[in-house]
Amino acid sequence: MGHRHSKSKSSDPPPSSSSSSSGNVVHHVKPAGERRGSSGSGTVGSSGSGTGGSRSTTSTQQNGRILGRPMEEVRRTYEFGRELGRGQFGVTYLVTHKETKQQVACKSIPTRRLVHKDDIEDVRREVQIMHHLSGHRNIVDLKGAYEDRHSVNLIMELCEGGELFDRIISKGLYSERAAADLCRQMVMVVHSCHSMGVMHRDLKPENFLFLSKDENSPLKATDFGLSVFFKPGDKFKDLVGSAYYVAPEVLKRNYGPEADIWSAGVILYILLSGVPPFWGENETGIFDAILQGQLDFSADPWPALSDGAKDLVRKMLKYDPKDRLTAAEVLNHPWIREDGEASDKPLDNAVLSRMKQFRAMNKLKKMALKVIAENLSEEEIIGLKEMFKSLDTDNNGIVTLEELRTGLPKLGSKISEAEIRQLMEAADMDGDGSIDYLEFISATMHMNRIEREDHLYTAFQFFDNDNSGYITMEELELAMKKYNMGDDKSIKEIIAEVDTDRDGKINYEEFVAMMKKGNPELVPNRRRM
């Protein structure tokens, strides 16, 4: 998921004078009614200055339609380098200031993708909120916002220390105390946001990066694209967030800032066990598990973990948001405090193994689904093919979000805007903001087709180029390059996690198990000696 679903209420942003810190999902359907909280250029236009050197503008310059202030070419000030990451709307690049030579990150959002009024308001609000929260040790610093004829460019502090899970896995040794330290930094972000009238709404491990590779580097929250301003008592109805981390009240469309605590609690559960607390074969299954809300502390490694760790997880994942701890109460919990009771005894290696698998598995599965889609018979996909043709109104072979939004209701579909966003997010494998024919078929074909033996064997044969009966690292690398879906590190991780007999290759049995199973416990349990 990791996307937006609808804003029924967004409170007005606090006045700009309150910008000092006091210490402290799913998709985006938005109703046609009045939206508050991101009215236009006021905050955005006045607060986005570039780093190093002045930005001169004249009154004759044309105002950009997104930020509502004079347009400027970001490339006049910054030299663009390699791509750092890719999201639903934009691409993040490493850029260098031409005068100061300072390296920063630039999130570049093509304005052609911001066709819907609410998408434009989301970008404006992201800029407002990042300026509003600037200066906090654990929040990435927004240094400036530029708009030219083609894109909005957000210049941000460069985080070179890698993602949360990457750091944990690369260190090898890991303890409750390390998990407590990471969780404390995340909850400090939540506390700061809430005390300044901001709800994050998309807390997940991928949205936290380390500033540097230094051992004591701070952890930084990096993505505020779904965040909103709120006032005490405000309730929101839009379905936003990311599947594993979304709170039950968000799924029920009646929630407040307590939903951020739930998401942080899910991350803590993963930090301690390597797997999410609520699991399903697909998004619907995950949501069903969340709505049931049954926490299980009987499986490994929970019996070996401290009572304090389990107590905090329980209190952050209370089903009723009124019973959940606040961010301030979490920070005062004896287990998480800096001088607290969390043990520095290393956790079982199986925790790291499960964490690696949770991170790596989806990439190979998505590629295999695309291969299956390529090889389905005309009879099997005739209905889906006709649906794609009717959605692709300009006959260019791709379906945009706007084409989905306007086309699905015409097909008699009762699909909600939230589900349309979900379909786009799930289907758009290469992250270009549109769905091609194969991506569409891959995302919409029924699960029973995936589990048919002939389809699985066809997919396996696609990867196994030399018909040796194994998928090697070289063969996986070729496939991932074809679909633009990963780097050398991802390839090694996939081999390591799917290859249960540890011979450096993936055999057919291992491939089928990976495709059919959603339970991340299965492989690590087989690995135990």
Swiss-Prot record:
Residues 1-73 are annotated as: Disordered. It comes from Arabidopsis thaliana (Mouse-ear cress). Gene3D superfamilies: EF-hand, Phosphorylase Kinase, domain 1, Transferase(Phosphotransferase) domain 1. GO terms for cellular component: cytosol; membrane; nucleus; plant-type vacuole; plasma membrane. Ca(2+) 4 binds at residues 499, 501, 503, 505, 510. SUPFAM superfamilies: EF-hand, Protein kinase-like (PK-like). Keywords: ATP-binding, Calcium, Cytoplasm, Kinase, Lipoprotein, Metal-binding, Myristate, Nucleotide-binding, Nucleus, Phosphoprotein, Repeat, Serine/threonine-protein kinase, Transferase. Ca(2+) 1 binds at residues 392, 394, 396, 403. It catalyses: L-seryl-[protein] + ATP = O-phospho-L-seryl-[protein] + ADP + H(+); L-threonyl-[protein] + ATP = O-phospho-L-threonyl-[protein] + ADP + H(+). Residues 342-372 are annotated as: Autoinhibitory domain. Pfam families: EF-hand_7, Pkinase. A lipid is attached at residue 2 (N-myristoyl glycine). ATP binds at residues 84-92, 107. Ca(2+) 3 binds at residues 464, 466, 468, 470, 475. Interacts with GHR1. Ca(2+) 2 binds at residues 428, 430, 432, 434, 439. One of its GO terms (molecular function) is ATP binding. Its EC number is 2.7.11.1. GO terms for biological process: abscisic acid-activated signaling pathway; protein autophosphorylation; regulation of anion channel activity; regulation of stomatal movement; response to salt stress. The modification Phosphoserine is found at residue 242. InterPro entries: CDPK_Ser/Thr_kinases, EF-hand-dom_pair, EF_Hand_1_Ca_BS, EF_hand_dom, Kinase-like_dom_sf, Prot_kinase_dom, Protein_kinase_ATP_BS, Ser/Thr_kinase_AS. Residues 379-414, 415-450, 451-485, 486-521 form the EF-hand domain. Its main location: cytoplasm. Expressed in both guard cells and mesophyll cells. The lineage of its organism: Eukaryota, Viridiplantae, Streptophyta, Embryophyta, Tracheophyta. The active site is at residue 202. Activated by calcium. Autophosphorylation may play an important role in the regulation of the kinase activity. This is Calcium-dependent protein kinase 3.
